[in-house]
Protein backbone atom coordinates (compact mmCIF):
# COMPACT_ATOMS: atom_id res chain seq x y z
CA UNK A 1 0.00 0.00 0.00
CA UNK A 2 1.38 3.37 -1.00
CA UNK A 3 1.62 5.95 1.75
CA UNK A 4 2.35 9.63 1.42
CA UNK A 5 2.99 11.93 4.33
CA UNK A 6 2.07 15.54 3.69
CA UNK A 7 4.98 17.66 4.84
CA UNK A 8 4.71 21.05 6.45
CA UNK A 9 4.30 23.89 3.94
CA UNK A 10 3.53 21.40 1.14
CA UNK A 11 0.48 21.91 -1.00
CA UNK A 12 -2.11 19.19 -1.37
CA UNK A 13 -1.48 19.16 -5.13
CA UNK A 14 2.19 18.30 -4.60
CA UNK A 15 1.32 15.57 -2.11
CA UNK A 16 -1.29 14.14 -4.49
CA UNK A 17 1.24 14.16 -7.31
CA UNK A 18 3.75 12.26 -5.12
CA UNK A 19 1.04 9.77 -4.13
CA UNK A 20 0.01 9.13 -7.73
CA UNK A 21 3.64 8.62 -8.70
CA UNK A 22 4.23 6.13 -5.88
CA UNK A 23 1.06 4.20 -6.78
CA UNK A 24 2.06 3.98 -10.44
CA UNK A 25 5.60 2.88 -9.55
CA UNK A 26 4.37 0.15 -7.22
CA UNK A 27 2.02 -1.19 -9.91
CA UNK A 28 -1.05 -1.14 -7.67
CA UNK A 29 -3.46 0.11 -10.33
CA UNK A 30 -2.19 -2.32 -12.96
CA UNK A 31 -2.65 -5.19 -10.52
CA UNK A 32 -6.16 -3.98 -9.69
CA UNK A 33 -7.15 -3.77 -13.35
CA UNK A 34 -5.71 -7.21 -14.00
CA UNK A 35 -7.68 -8.78 -11.14
CA UNK A 36 -10.88 -6.77 -11.54
CA UNK A 37 -12.63 -9.56 -13.46
CA UNK A 38 -11.98 -13.28 -13.55
CA UNK A 39 -10.25 -14.51 -16.68
CA UNK A 40 -10.42 -18.14 -17.64
CA UNK A 41 -7.03 -19.81 -18.04
CA UNK A 42 -7.68 -20.27 -21.77
CA UNK A 43 -8.28 -16.54 -22.16
CA UNK A 44 -5.10 -15.76 -20.22
CA UNK A 45 -3.09 -18.01 -22.52
CA UNK A 46 -4.63 -16.38 -25.59
CA UNK A 47 -3.85 -12.85 -24.36
CA UNK A 48 -0.32 -13.88 -23.42
CA UNK A 49 0.32 -15.32 -26.88
CA UNK A 50 -1.13 -12.23 -28.58
CA UNK A 51 1.12 -9.98 -26.49
CA UNK A 52 4.15 -12.06 -27.46
CA UNK A 53 3.15 -11.84 -31.11
CA UNK A 54 2.89 -8.04 -30.85
CA UNK A 55 6.32 -7.83 -29.23
CA UNK A 56 7.90 -9.92 -32.00
CA UNK A 57 6.23 -7.92 -34.78
CA UNK A 58 7.98 -4.58 -34.99
UniProtKB/Swiss-Prot annotation:
Domain of life: Bacteria
GO CC terms, sorted: ribonucleoprotein complex; ribosome
GO MF annotations, alphabetized: structural constituent of ribosome
GO biological process, any: translation
Keyword annotations of the record: Ribonucleoprotein, Ribosomal protein
Family from the record: Belongs to the bacterial ribosomal protein bS21 family.
PANTHER family according to UniProt: MITOCHONDRIAL 28S RIBOSOMAL PROTEIN S21 (PTHR21109), SMALL RIBOSOMAL SUBUNIT PROTEIN BS21 (PTHR21109:SF22)
Matching HAMAP family: Ribosomal_bS21
Record's protein name: Small ribosomal subunit protein bS21
Source organism per UniProt: Lactobacillus johnsonii (strain CNCM I-12250 / La1 / NCC 533)
